[in-house]
Amino acid sequence: MLKLAVIGKDVSKSDSGRMHTFILRGLGRDCSYELMSSSAEDFDTNAKKLLAEYDAFNVTIPYKLDIIPYLERTEGDAVTFGAVNTVKGGIGYNTDGAGFSLMLKNNGIDPAGRKVLVLGA
């Protein structure tokens, strides 16, 4: 069984657990997905627990920068953006840009030659 989680300041209303569980179970994978709200004071303990005990986890505000020193390395867009929203095997990734690009493509929007402002990623 995959052990997954999301960590953020207050993730009590997050849909991440339902979304990831639905998708993974649809693919025939058994998983659990924990919502881990963390204060700044508890972040060190929680980050270490996630890295030691979970297969992968998501990171949301305000910890997308704070998680980086705990990681072995960052790859891809996480290097470019300097922020991490997904961790697997001690490696940090950022899927925000790819997700945004996919949304544009799926809605027939071509940003080529246009100015784009992204807020809240």
Feature-to-residue mapping (PLM):
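Glycine-rich Rossmann-fold phosphate-binding loop(s) that bind the pyrophosphate
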Residues: 9, 120-121
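Short helix-loop-beta connector
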Residues: 109-115
